[in-house]
């Protein structure tokens, strides 16, 4: 059994007190939740502290909370902010764990079959396991997630039933524990000890939980009784503390057993017979032969190995669901009274709505042409109405709420005033002729003041050409695009703040929620090209990126002023006047937000060449205290020895060089 802690309260830690619009917004939202309001909207302008407001609401209502974000970059930023506000509670991160993902597909026009190909990020997989285990263990949990949260995850009941619970004094044979660990997909490896593995030394069993990468559990036996449970540093073996009870969660979210597997394979066989008869009656003999060959092979693998490539396509049979029933998702791991916060809801909710249709169109081709059984269609994301059925209470959060939110509720809480006194940026419209020379001049002015610049373009080609052009002029520039891996996007944002880059060029990634106070200029190229990227809502969001700096300004390069441009400028001017009046009344002088630069998510890296230095480790070294510097060097030395022990001499040599550089820097 899992001892779920339901008496833990959220502990908000902040040196700030709610000011401006925040106290009223917090009170209204809290009252709405306590009064049973199903849906509310927090209409908050950029830089007004919406995350801080929501944090106060979470503390007040004390409910497990899912914060839904529309992209991984913003999710990573929110994760860092909530961790800072709630250091004593469980703040988790749940996004797709694929660094690269090519879904299975078939293109009839060219008779091209594309096999599924993917690369899994181990760090994100760990964070996903941490999220689900926290939800089952405690009540004070905030999970920041992308739309990955509405994709299939496995039955939470099966996952919970497979948890191995261990207590000091418990009678259990050592070998029985080993069998339990293997049953929940842990792998025995006495030499390469890492997540999801265990090792055995006599009466001592060491277990590395799937949800952690720094601490392992040491279970010591005396005969057939657990004598002691210790938490140890996985790298050094140093004892961190003793535990009376531990719960070992499965190493995979997709748990099954022999009975379920037998029932599933029998069901798949029955469906295969029906589908083959259907295809043959329609004269689709090639499709029937293809389906029979592929499915028969999968069934053989499932019986012999308990697994096959693409097993997720049989998830309906594995879960015991009926045709058309929704899959289990992260939402099923939450208790029924959880709170949902949809960040940048005007983008996130349309994204949630579109997930099912896109997935269905691709899979229908696979079914029609004999690559998959019809049950594969039930391996899918949730439909919008299915997501709505999970919602207990929701707060839609946006500076520009969309039509969907307006249909759900008329309970709108406004938050326009910034506690910092910062004004919405000034907006200047300039002609397209000579825009490059003008833009470079503006960028150089910001560089002289140690400020940063965002430039947003309409196409990928334009962004790439602009990036190359600025690089040729010696400007430190980065191009933020969709091909960049999840955690690297967050790192690029951090590097911009640190001054490694002065300019960031993007298309659709420099909008909602990107929070960089050093940015004082946002340049919008082709602002008069009406469309999705240049409509009123998009322009207001883009303009908001310059609203966190007291020198914030926006330049729109356009030959005419469109209705969208005018509406965005009018709304910005309205908000600016409200803030000016508030500042005058309270004697506030606008000041740029001072925000600490921190690593949001630890990313494990490996150098491609032995001669490269671990700059990602050393980047903040000179800013550390002497004591912290020595601790970091000691830890890197441990990592170096561990890498050498695993015969990873390339990594060991790289760490050695980094350590030598650090010791030289401190004069050791």
Swiss-Prot record:
GO terms for biological process: nucleotide-excision repair; SOS response. Residues 630-665 form the UVR domain. It comes from Levilactobacillus brevis (strain ATCC 367 / BCRC 12310 / CIP 105137 / JCM 1170 / LMG 11437 / NCIMB 947 / NCTC 947) (Lactobacillus brevis). The gene is uvrB. It comes from the Bacteria. Keywords: ATP-binding, Cytoplasm, DNA damage, DNA excision, DNA repair, Excision nuclease, Helicase, Hydrolase, Nucleotide-binding, SOS response. This is UvrABC system protein B. One of its GO terms (molecular function) is ATP hydrolysis activity. ATP binds at residues 44-51. GO terms for cellular component: cytoplasm; excinuclease repair complex. A motif (Beta-hairpin) lies at residues 97-120. SUPFAM superfamilies: C-terminal UvrC-binding domain of UvrB, P-loop containing nucleoside triphosphate hydrolases. InterPro entries: Helicase/UvrB_N, Helicase_ATP-bd, Helicase_C-like, P-loop_NTPase, UVR_dom, UVR_dom_sf, UvrB, UvrB_inter. Residues 435-601 form the Helicase C-terminal domain.
């Amino acid at each position: 059994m899992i001892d779920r802690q339901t008496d833990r309260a959220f502990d908000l830690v902040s040196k700030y007190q709610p000011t401006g619009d925040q106290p009223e917004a917090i009170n209204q939202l809290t009252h709405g939740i306590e009064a049973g309001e199903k849906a509310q909207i927090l209409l908050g302008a950029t830089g007004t502290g919406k995350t801080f407001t929501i944090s106060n609401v979470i503390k007040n209502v004390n409910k497990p909370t899912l914060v839904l974000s529309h992209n991984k970059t913003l999710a990573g930023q929110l994760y860092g902010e909530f961790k800072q506000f709630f250091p004593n509670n469980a703040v988790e991160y749940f996004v797709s764990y694929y660094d690269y993902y090519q879904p299975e597909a078939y293109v009839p026009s060219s008779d091209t079959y594309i096999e599924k190909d993917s690369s899994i990020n181990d760090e994100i997989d760990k964070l996903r396991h941490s999220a689900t285990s926290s939800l089952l263990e405690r009540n004070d949990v905030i999970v920041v997630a992308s739309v990955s949260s509405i994709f299939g995850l496995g039955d939470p009941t099966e996952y919970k039933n497979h948890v191995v619970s261990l207590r000091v004094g418990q009678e259990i044979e050592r070998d029985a524990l080993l069998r339990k660990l293997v049953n929940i997909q842990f792998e025995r490896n006495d030499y390469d000890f890492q997540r999801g593995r265990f090792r055995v030394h006599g009466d001592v069993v060491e277990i590395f939980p799937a949800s952690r990468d720094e601490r392992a559990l040491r279970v010591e036996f005396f005969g057939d009784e657990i004598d002691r449970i210790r938490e140890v540093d996985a790298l050094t073996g140093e004892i961190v503390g003793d535990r009376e009870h531990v719960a070992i969660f499965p190493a995979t979210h997709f748990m099954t057993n022999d009975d379920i597997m037998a029932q599933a394979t029998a069901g798949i066989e029955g469906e295969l017979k029906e589908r083959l008869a259907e295809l043959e009656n329609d004269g689709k003999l090639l499709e029937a032969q293809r389906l029979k060959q592929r499915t028969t092979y999968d069934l053989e693998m499932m019986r012999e190995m308990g697994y096959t490539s693409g097993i997720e396509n049989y998830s309906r049979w594995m879960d015991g669901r009926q045709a058309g029933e929704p899959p289990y998702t992260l939402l099923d791991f939450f208790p029924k009274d959880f709170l949902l916060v949809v960040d940048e809801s005007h983008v996130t909710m349309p994204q949630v709505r579109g997930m099912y249709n896109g997935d269905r169109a691709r899979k229908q081709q696979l079914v029609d042409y004999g690559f998959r059984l019809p049950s594969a269609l039930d391996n899918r994301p949730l439909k919008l109405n299915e997501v709505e059925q999970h919602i207990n209470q929701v707060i839609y959060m946006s500076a520009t709420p969309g039509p969907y939110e307006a249909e759900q509720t008329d309970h709108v809480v406004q938050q326009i005033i910034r506690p910092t006194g910062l004004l919405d940026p000034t907006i200047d419209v300039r002609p397209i002729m000579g825009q490059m020379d003008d833009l470079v001049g503006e960028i150089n002015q910001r560089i002289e003041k140690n400020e940063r610049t965002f430039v947003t373009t309409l196409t990928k080609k334009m962004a790439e050409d602009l990036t190359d052009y600025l690089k040729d002029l010696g400007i430190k520039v980065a191009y933020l695009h969709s091909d960049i891996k999840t955690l690297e996007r967050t790192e690029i944002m951090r590097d911009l703040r640190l001054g490694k880059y002065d300019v960031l060029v993007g298309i659709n990634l420099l909008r909602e929620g990107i929070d960089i106070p050093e940015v004082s200029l946002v340049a919008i190229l082709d602002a008069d090209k009406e469309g999705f990227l240049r409509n009123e809502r998009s322009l207001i969001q883009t303009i908001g990126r310059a609203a966190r700096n007291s020198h914030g300004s926006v330049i729109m390069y356009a030959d005419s002023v469109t209705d969208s441009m005018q509406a965005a400028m009018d709304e910005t001017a309205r908000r600016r006047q409200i803030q000016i009046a508030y500042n005058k009344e309270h004697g506030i002088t606008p000041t740029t937000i001072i925000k600490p630069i921190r690593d949001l998510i630890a990313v494990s890296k490996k150098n491609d060449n032995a001669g490269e230095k671990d700059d990602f480790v050393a980047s903040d070294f000179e800013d550390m205290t002497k004591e912290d510097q020595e601790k970091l060097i000691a830890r890197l030395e441990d990592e170096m020895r561990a890498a050498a022990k695993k015969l990873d001499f390339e990594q060991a040599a790289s760490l050695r060089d980094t350590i030598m550089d650090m010791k030289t820097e401190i004069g050791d």
